[in-house]
Amino acid sequence: LVTLFTCVEYSQAQTTEKEMTRQEKKAAQEALDKMLFQEAKEAIDNQTFVLEADRVYFKYGTSAFVSSNTNFVGLDGDKAVVQVAFNVPFSGPNGLGGITVDGNASNYKVKTDKKGNIHVSMNVMGIGISAQVNIDIPYGSNNATVDILPNFNSSHMTLSGQILPLKKANVFKGRSL
């Protein structure tokens, strides 16, 4: 009988310890997410950021997982880069299986809604692109989506990934158009 009570108490102690561990993990993850959000917000305010995309959504809803170091949208002051590179057997114009466009960013606007979500919009003008770029970042996260809306055709594309300060970005830029 004493052994039974000891076993029950021991299992309850383990359960409480596990729950504490889960709560601690959740609190640590929330703190990390908040820190990454603040870092992304500062990078956006300074106009020195990169969205490293790990997923691409195409015009009709199909999607593909892609490499985040070759698929990105970046801004450094008034200079913008949009690069997409797919895992295909041919090299494409940028040498990576996609396109890389350098351009000038204009009409840069940042808005924060009542819930703290951030919306960034800008126009990117380059040799191979003239597009509206819209970035949405939900409050408390550095995960974001970017909609690329070309002005000359209807090849709408959406990328999703993480917003990082330019100095922390790990991207490989291909040949520009």
Regions found by a protein language model. Give the residues of each.
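Helix-rich interaction surfaces within compact, conserved domain-sized segments
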Residues: 19, 39, 107-177
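N-terminal secretory signal peptides
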Residues: 19-91, 157-159, 167-175
